[in-house]
Amino acid sequence: MSDKLIIFDTTLRDGEQSPGASMTRDEKLRIARQLERLRVDVIEAGFAASSNGDFEAVQAIAQAIKDSTVCSLSRANDRDIARAAEALKDAQRARIHTFIATSPLHMEKKLRMTPEQVLEQAKQSVRFARNLVADIEFSPEDGYRSEPDFLCRVLEAVIAEGATTINVPDTVGYAIPELYGNFIRNLRERIPNSDKAVWSVHCHNDLGMAVANSLAGVKIGGARQVECTINGLGERAGNCSLEEIVMAVKTRRDYFGLELGIDTQHIVAASRMVSQTTGFVVQPNKAVVGANAFAHASGIHQDGVLKARDTYEIMRAEDVGWTANKIVLGKLSGRNAFKQRLQDLGVQLESEADVNAAFLRFKELADRKSEIFDEDILALVSGDATAGAGERYGFVSLSQRSETGERPHAAVVFTVDGKEVHGASEGNGPVDASLKAIESHVHSGAEMVLYSVNAISGSTESQGEVTVRLQDSGRVVNGVGADPDIVVASAKAYLSALNKLQSKAERVAAQG
């Protein structure tokens, strides 16, 4: 058995299924590049057959990524598999991940198929996929709640058809660590050809045990791949957290005895990027990447850490990418210094034109804010609200008037399909007025279900990072905007959310 643990990141696919976490093609590409910098083994870039937008994102990532394997999810049918292969055709290393449900509940209620029909479809899908790419992963959806005898038949059959990775998901987060570990081990022991494939675990966090279950699948079950997401992002209670699984295996190498290819010094940068892109703020006490992960308030603890760090710290903050909050650039900094700082932070823009545009935004920020932190630069790049390729709305400018005893008034200039429009409105506050000014032209009809503000750094002149969550016709999206002026940040976030609603509507229309 291999002593290398493969890290399979599904932030861009399963993570994006978290309500409001939808990402644009460019946002996915930026995160994929950071995952490659992190040296993730496999990047699940999306579900190519689900929409034209997902196909384009998988295709762009397949073309850009050189070191990591790029994977697309696919249902167990020829159309989905062919679409995935087409999106992956330019990848240096391509994987198709095909799946079909195998639990009695799913087969009867969702698929309306007999076990024999499911078995045949699983075999056919792997056989077809293997003719298109060499690296095939198969997942029995709701595998943990499947009948073991039937599951063994399915997995033995798909390995015989050429599946190179067998992933056994705890789709609804029902498992308990010891039971899940034994479940994986029993499958491997009962299936005659189990040694022909890498065994993988995919655990959800509904009972708060996704990481524990995954570790049990590795230690007890002998799995050598873990599927996970940055910050544990995912639908319902989320997925197994990449940063936690990686640091558990690295910190307790004495127990697990496994090697990792991950460059852990890029973990915090990846966490920040995903948080700022999706608008999902990382809780302060989140293991490894939370703001308090290496903080000590107790006097006894502080005294111990000052004398010897290992009295209360089992890993070093700098090993996962935490650095002191320091000024990195100022208004006199040049373009080359800015470009180098982007590279140090794991940000790779697509073209020199994009670098130039980002540098101009940086200079504008530096004129307004005396101290520029890493967080400011990441927010500046992630929270750009100017209309990108394929985006309908873009922020241009905003002015407001507010005096005590009078209703605030805001005027917003923004673009719609490349043409400038001017909106103006009064409101209950400056933010309300600015968003009503936008709506006076857009008429989206969307309901705002969340509005939150987060200070990016600790000073009074900090940029505010605003998250706006909109809901319309069952679609939920988050928009993020950043600016030292909270009203401007709010307008940017609102336009970002409108762009994502538009993108989701186009995906639904494309699916028919």
UniProtKB/Swiss-Prot annotation:
Region (Regulatory domain): 394-512
GO molecular function list: 2-isopropylmalate synthase activity; acetyl-CoA C-acetyltransferase activity; manganese ion binding
A GO BP annotation: L-leucine biosynthetic process
Keywords assigned by UniProt, alphabetized: Amino-acid biosynthesis, Branched-chain amino acid biosynthesis, Cytoplasm, Leucine biosynthesis, Manganese, Metal-binding, Transferase
Residues annotated as domain Pyruvate carboxyltransferase: 5-268
Pathway(s) this gene product operates in, as recorded in its UniProt entry: Amino-acid biosynthesis; L-leucine biosynthesis; L-leucine from 3-methyl-2-oxobutanoate: step 1/4
A single GO cellular-component term on record: cytosol
Gene3D superfamilies per record: 1.10.238.260, 3.30.160.270, Aldolase class I (3.20.20.70)
A Pfam family the protein falls into: LeuA_dimer
Binding site for Mn(2+): 14, 202, 204, 239
Co-factor(s): Mn(2+)
TM region positions: none
Keyword Oxidoreductase belongs to the record: no
Subcellular location: Cytoplasm
Keyword Metal-binding among UniProt keywords: yes
PROSITE patterns xref list: AIPM_HOMOCIT_SYNTH_1, AIPM_HOMOCIT_SYNTH_2, PYR_CT
Assembly information from the UniProt record: Homodimer.
UniProt protein name: 2-isopropylmalate synthase
